[in-house]
């Protein structure tokens, strides 16, 4: 990419900044927030957060070739220009947008946020747009899709950093795309990873109990999600038009708050209240869901291939977003009927075993509840659930999830899920205590098995023909964290290895963990 002058990066910089040396005609070849990645001609943005403070690595960045630095500390005497700002993350977002020549201003940007269902809904919208002939791209917590190219966006689930997001948007624009669906997490919003993304359409799935370890309270978590909707009013005028539309879930507890936050246009969807996009007469079976769609004067019976009644709500949100993006009604309905499953979301693993095996990403109390309710719809026999709860995260969540599982599953197996530096034994003890208080009986209706592979094996051993075994919490993720180390792990690989062992099939190996 052609270098951009440092002075040009600050031409439309919307937040206060100060420097002893005005940004001049210094060519900037790249922007980095990790000093280890810096190369000659780069701008280094020092970010404080977590266990690392980027300001401690300014000298290293300069020695690697940084020609300018942005940070929040009062620093003098550097051999390169230093620009001080109040928030380095916010600055990084605006600088990245300017570096890539503000690609979001030339695209229709559809943001999807929520606690549960946002990856599925984002993929639904993307698939409907593509099938309708819209030149669309996707940035999710699983991958970025740019034309025929699919880019992995990382091991764990969150929105990519601002430089990566703006880079993806730039590549999409260069590839001739006109629309992008951007899955947007609360961390992505709170940490300004999606600042300067110029949202045109904002969609919420739901806002329930999650990430309170980071946000502190539900209200703060909800406020972080709300930033996307508040930002609609600031979206610049675009050649493609300015929908500036909020799509809200009338059935969710977040509705009143978000409806009050949105200053412009908004539409609603739901199953429990009369809304702009309404569904009734829902039926579900292992092959998908059927419902009657009532919207825009239309009453139409719709089929979706994704199982679970919860997906009806996702369908409504996706349909509303597609219509807002200009897709004709008939094409949007046809798109719903052709949707494919999302990796790691109620994903069936089929190897000829006499029972159902599912891998799902459910890692919150509400998502686990929905996953187990869906599992109940998929079998008339028993449901056996294998899952854990992450370390160094909201501790209340692990108790709530254990309670949900002993109430909805016939057998629950508590196991590792990214314990990080927290004691796995303590996490499992908390889950077992909550399960016991909820009426569970250890050794009969629930078990503790530290090693996740062994836990999945136990689940398989306990199944009978017609049962359903579901492993929740990891979904598409490709690693698990013990201590500070990420170990390769994929629940789908582990499930296949387990089934292969049972069926006597060669060629499958269980991933190894420190607990193995």
Where are these regions (language model features)?
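Non-catalytic positions within long, well-ordered alpha-helices that form the structural scaffold/packing
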Residues: 58-63, 173, 195, 376
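N-terminal leader/targeting and accessory segments in enzymes
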Residues: 1-94, 98, 278-280, 299, ...
